[in-house]
Amino acid sequence: MTPLYQLTVAQAREMLARGEISSLELTDALLTRIAAVEPKVRAFLVVDAAGARAQARAADARRAAGDASPLLGIPMGIKDVISTQGLRTTCASKMLENYTPVYDATAVARLKAAGAVILGKLNCDEFAMGSSTENSAFQQTRNPWNLERVPGGSSGGSAAAVAAGEAPAALGTDTGGSIRQPAALCGITGLKPTYGRVSRYGLVAFASSLDQIGPMARTVRDCAIVLRVIAGADPFDATCTDYPAPDYEAALTGDIRGLRIGVPREYFVAGMQPDVEAAVRTAIEVLREQGAEVCEISLPHTPYALPVYYLIAPAEASANLARFDGVRYGLRVPGESYFDELERTRGAGFGPEVRRRIMLGTYALSAGYYDAYYKRAQQVRTLIRRDYQQAFEQVDVIAAPTTPTVAFKIGAHTDDPLAMYLEDVCTLPLNLAGLPGLVVPCGFAEGLPIGLQLIGRAFDEESLLRVGDAYQRVTDWHTRMPEVREDGSA
């Protein structure tokens, strides 16, 4: 029998529905798994064992009473930038080390209403700023495939937990690739929905025009199940659209014959690891063999996406993080005056990467530089969005690499912020355009996973899920799980 911690969401749902296992048994199995591997992987910042068991018992009682909610009794983890009532939400920052929200984010509330069991909060880069989870103020999450490598970021804890069998699914957030990049590096499936598909209410904001909550799991089907629960209009988020959430599972037909898939030449960047490019191109050929029509396309403004992103995102972050001043909540360091106290508090509360982005954003918004930097970046953002609009007049889905390399060693880019920023070169253009992106495992190099990225039209997650599911029906990359060893190897 498959160990319970290896079950996918869909498998667990079926076994729970048939009465073969209880939610409490499943939750206990995962808590046991967490206890066994967490000292090595370090994906969780908070494990709420007592709360999870109580929720599992409640789920079993609901099922006995005839409830058949879509996630009833399914344990999940939550990235620690998403508010959870009564459960510490730190954003992996000293600034919010002891902050406990008094309300749930809309996405979390919807998970709970659907019967999900919340196992705890998952590590991330501080305030979701980073690509390796090395910027967490509390601990370094490690890639379960090789404990000397990063899991990616900023949703590194979410990706590592799913890959290591500590949770069948988790919520992550994606501002410039923070669901897709760690999903690729940890060998799991991750979906960044269209901007506005999922409510951001209760998400601690990094860059408000870019942030999006999405599911991370082992299979496309699991992501479809979770997305249907968390998607939809929310009166608490004016940027959340009122488009009805379709039945995403119904889109998983396995048939992609005649679907037009474009391959953008600009995504195969200079310096890309040859094995990564080969794996992605092989995966695209698999889609061709399944009946898809594949052609090369151009997204000419893609090379400008990186500098545009690193003007717009820090500018929004500098405004959003101004609220953390030590006056109303969070860390407070006494000073001789209000301004001295503010300087001491923010200096002690924010890590170096957060401070760097605040300074960069403040500069971009300052008088005399606004037109030259921020305004011009927004103009180029429009051109990037237009590139995608024109491409989708020719194709239905775009297929591309997710990362230029496999997971790098912990500490490899610590002293080189630009090298770290380049890790997101294939993912952040989607955020600027507000489009959905799906990552599925498509191979290995150096014993480390590689991810294929699928990009769709706005609010057409169904096509992405259909293509990703079709790919997973004829490949087994997504079924492979790492064996976490003491020596840091896989």
Curated annotation (Swiss-Prot):
Active site: residue positions: K79, S154, S178
Identification of the protein by name: Glutamyl-tRNA(Gln) amidotransferase subunit A
Organism: Roseiflexus castenholzii (strain DSM 13941 / HLO8)
Function: Allows the formation of correctly charged Gln-tRNA(Gln) through the transamidation of misacylated Glu-tRNA(Gln) in organisms which lack glutaminyl-tRNA synthetase. The reaction takes place in the presence of glutamine and ATP through an activated gamma-phospho-Glu-tRNA(Gln).
Catalysed reaction, written as an equation: L-glutamyl-tRNA(Gln) + L-glutamine + ATP + H2O = L-glutaminyl-tRNA(Gln) + L-glutamate + ADP + phosphate + H(+)
Family annotation (PROSITE patterns): AMIDASES
InterPro entries xref list: Amidase, Amidase_CS, Amidase_dom, AS_sf, GatA
Keyword terms of this UniProt record: ATP-binding, Ligase, Nucleotide-binding, Protein biosynthesis
Pfam families xref list: Amidase
A GO MF label: ATP binding
Its EC number(s): 6.3.5.7
